[in-house]
Each structure stands twice: as C-alpha cells, then as structure tokens.
Swiss-Prot record:
Disulfide-linked positions: none
GO annotation terms (biological process): tRNA methylation; tRNA wobble uridine modification
Domain of life (superkingdom): Bacteria
Reaction(s) the record says it catalyses: uridine(54) in tRNA + (6R)-5,10-methylene-5,6,7,8-tetrahydrofolate + NADH + H(+) = 5-methyluridine(54) in tRNA + (6S)-5,6,7,8-tetrahydrofolate + NAD(+); uridine(54) in tRNA + (6R)-5,10-methylene-5,6,7,8-tetrahydrofolate + NADPH + H(+) = 5-methyluridine(54) in tRNA + (6S)-5,6,7,8-tetrahydrofolate + NADP(+)
Primary site of residence: cytoplasm
Protein family (similarity comment): Belongs to the MnmG family. TrmFO subfamily.
Function: Catalyzes the folate-dependent formation of 5-methyl-uridine at position 54 (M-5-U54) in all tRNAs.
Subcellular location(s) of the protein: Cytoplasm
Listed GO MF terms: flavin adenine dinucleotide binding; tRNA (uracil(54)-C5)-methyltransferase activity, 5,10-methylenetetrahydrofolate-dependent
Transmembrane segments: none
UniProt cross-references to SUPFAM superfamilies, sorted A to Z: FAD/NAD(P)-binding domain (SSF51905)
Record-given protein name: Methylenetetrahydrofolate--tRNA-(uracil-5-)-methyltransferase TrmFO
Record: residues binding FAD: 10-15
Length: 434
C-alpha cells in the first residue's frame, strides 16, 4: 500500500464518492469537511452527501442518459448509488431516496472505511500533494478566493446563467435557416424567424410565465451583467426586438425580407448535435419554459436537453483548465470534481467524483490516469466539460446528445436511446476493475 495520502476537500456527493474510490484502492484519504464547524446557507446537517434540493436522483431507466450513468456507476461500485438504492422510496421510473437515511448511509460507508480520516475544519488554502477539490456550488469565500487566484479571474464563476439547449434532430429545419448576421464569416447560426403576430403570442406567454423563486443567497446574480430574458421582456415589448431577438442583418433567404424578430440557435457541441438558444438565459420554471420555447417557429417539437437556469453555482472553466481525467492541466496531482467542474446534477457530480477518485488513486500508485470513452455516459460528461467551446461554457446534465454518435443512424428515439445505452454498458465493462 502506498504511503502517500490524498486530500479530498468537501464531503458532498462528489467528495464522498471520490474518497470512497480512493480508499477502496488501498490509498489513505484525508477528507476535509467544514460542516458543522462552518455551515453553508443551504445545508442543515453535518452528514456527508446531504441533498439540499430535491430527493430525486432522476430517471432510473436505460432509456434516459442519467439512468445509463447510474448503471455504469453501479458496475463500478459507486457508494452514492449503492446508498441510494438501499434508501430508495417509491418514485415511478425515478430513483428517489429518503434524504436523511441516504446521507446517514453515505456518511457511515465513507467515515468507517479504515483508509479514511475525516477532518472537520475549513480549508482556506489549496494543500500541497495529491488533492481533489470537490467543494460544490457553495464553496466558502476564502477558498473561492484561492481558487479564483489559481485559475484566473476570467475562468472562475459564481453563478450559472445558462440558456436552454435543444437537440438538433428535433428542430424543424423547414422553418429555420442557416445564416450569420450580415453574412459575416461562415453561416454559423440557425435562425428562427417570427412574424409580428408570432412574436406577440410569444411575448405574452413569456411575461406571464411562472419563474423559480430566488433563494436569499442567489439574489445578487442578476446584477452581474446577465439579465434573464423574461426580465428584459418585462421592460417593454421592444426590448427583445432590439436585444437578443434583433432581426437586422438576418434576412430570410426564402422571402428576401427581414423578419419582425429572430431567435438564434448556436452550435453547442463539437459533434453538432446540440444547439443553445442565444441570449435566452432564464429563471422560468421548466414546465412554463418548455411551453414558451415551443412557441418559437421551428422549435414546436424541440427536445430540450438542458433547461435554462440562473442560480448560485461556483464553477470553473473546465475546457481551459481540466483534462478529461479531471486533472488540472497546470498541476498533475490536483483534481477537481462535482458541480465545480461544470457537471450539473446529483448523479453527474457523484460520477465525476468517482472518476477523479479512481484517477487520484492511480496517480499515487504510479499508474496512468484513465480517460473513459465518450461512448459511455461518464466519458461523455468528462469529454463535454473539457472539450466544448470554452467561450460559452455552462454547466450541463447528462444527455444522449453528449454521447459519441452511433455508427448507424437510428430514426426512432426509443430505439436510438436503447442503442446508446447498450453500447455504453458494453464498453464500461472494460473498466470495472481499474
């Protein structure tokens, strides 16, 4: 057994998973958790992996990408998924848990491992030696300042302001056209033209739609230069037409005329399977958000893979800073995991901790860190956060749009998703003993 110790900072979903994966590989772990010495605005206990929002870990079926990532994690002995399975409550096709029992179970499994030493103190500096930073969206101010200094001000963020992302295959291409404003450079945007009547219908639905209530510690985010589209709309009907829906320079090639308003979609991934809705960061609830977006011509049947969100979230610009092993590019023995890396969601956070933990253990044991193929759910997430466009990087949930394309195109969605799942689980079998 190696005498080196790996520091893991944060005992949330990612940190708990990382600590467990390191410990079970015979490596000593020093797990730092500042609670209960210092609480966050969202936590209520000193337990590991406390779920601060929903008690659902989302879909549990293989027809959904997050169901696939769970199954991959089961195969790789995830402590988070094991505890969730043991503490599950009825939730249809989803995996929901008794949150108190779940946190207690994770705490028990991790804390009682002979290779784990828990240190209840707040770290304000990044330690030397092998370290995983998994401090989550509510990282303490002192450590956040250190991370900002490490990564550079331009690569460290304090909130999400993410526009919705849709699957390209679900866009009605007969209603949209490819063009850049004033034809500058290559045609890079899909444009959804609106008549005045279509815009009026969209506008009225937008300003009437229900928004998510802000938590007290989130109220400053709208003053950081990123306005939700519904707040812009509330300032007057023309605000959008002169803002994100500005039509000038975007003549419709079918008519030769400038539409009344235009919604632009920009490619979001290297494979060109996902498009984000430009300038549409929003705080609308997901149900109303879908109804409003489907009033946009061409998006009537759009499959939304990530809804627009605006909330407090400490994260880094992973495409510039991380490798798909979750290693920091400038320091091989420093890893990041969890929502701080730009993965979004309970399961995705734990999955990043699983891979970061495995790779930290491999590093101190003199083995090469592992890159999972992007045909797997875990590999596709690691690939997305490290290979996507750094300029417009925003956190992302697991979805099939991130997976490497299938060799053979399958038209029916259910069959296509099944093929993604089958290929992923066959591939992950090659990594279960790493």
């Amino acid at each position: 057994m190696t005498t080196q110790v790996v520091n893991v900072i944060g005992a949330g979903l990612a940190g708990s998973e990382a600590a467990y994966q390191i410990a079970k590989r015979g490596v000593q772990v020093r797990l730092y958790e500042m609670r209960p010495v210092r609480q966050t605005p969202a936590h209520h206990t000193d337990k590991f992996a406390e779920l601060v929002c929903s008690n659902s870990l989302r879909a549990n079926t293989l027809t959904n990408a997050v169901g696939v990532i769970k199954e991959e994690m089961r195969l790789m002995d995830s402590v988070i998924i094991r505890a969730a399975d043991e503490c599950s409550v009825p939730a249809g096709g989803a995996l929901a848990v008794d949150r108190h029992e779940f946190a207690a179970k994770v705490t028990e499994y991790v804390k009682n491992h002979p290779n784990v030493t828990v240190v209840n103190e707040e770290l304000t500096e990044i330690p030397e030696g092998p370290t995983i930073i998994a401090t989550g969206p509510l990282t303490s101010p002192d450590l956040a300042a250190q991370l900002k200094e490490l990564t550079g001000e331009d690569y460290f963020y304090f909130y999400d302001a993410a526009a919705p992302i849709v699957e390209k295959d679900s866009i009605d291409m007969n209603k949209v056209y490819l063009k850049s404003r004033y034809d500058k450079g290559e045609a890079a945007y899909l444009n959804c033209p609106m008549t005045e009547e279509e815009f009026d219908r969209f506008y009225e639905a937008l300003i009437a739609a229900e928004t998510v209530p802000l938590k007290e510690f989130e109220k400053e985010i709208f003053f950081e230069g990123c306005m939700p589209v519904e707040v812009m709309a509330s300032r007057g009907r023309q605000t959008l037409v002169f803002g994100p829906m500005k039509p000038v320079g975007l003549e419709d090639p079918k008519t030769g005329k400038t539409p009344y308003a235009v919604v632009q979609l920009r490619q979001d991934d290297a494979a060109g399977t996902l498009y984000n809705i430009v300038g549409f960061q929003t705080h609308l609830k997901w149900g109303p958000q879908k109804e409003v977006l489907q009033l946009i011509p061409g998006l009537e049947n759009a499959e939304i893979v990530r809804y627009g969100v605006m909330h407090r979230n400490t994260f880094i610009n992973s495409p510039n800073l991380l490798r798909p092993t979750y290693q920091y590019k400038q320091r091989d023995d420093l890893f990041f995991a969890g929502q701080m890396t730009g993965v979004e969601g309970y399961v995705e956070s734990a999955a990043s901790g699983l891979l970061a933990g495995i790779n930290a253990a491999r590093l101190v044991q003199g083995e090469e860190p592992v890159v999972l193929p992007s045909v797997t759910a875990m590999g596709s997430m690691a690939n997305y956060i490290t290979a996507t466009n750094a300029k417009n990087f925003q956190p992302m949930n697991a979805n099939f749009g991130l997976f490497a394309p299938l060799e053979k195109k399958i038209k029916k969605k259910a069959e296509r998703n099944e093929a993604y799942a089958t290929r992923a689980l066959e591939t992950i079998q090659n990594f279960v003993n790493i």
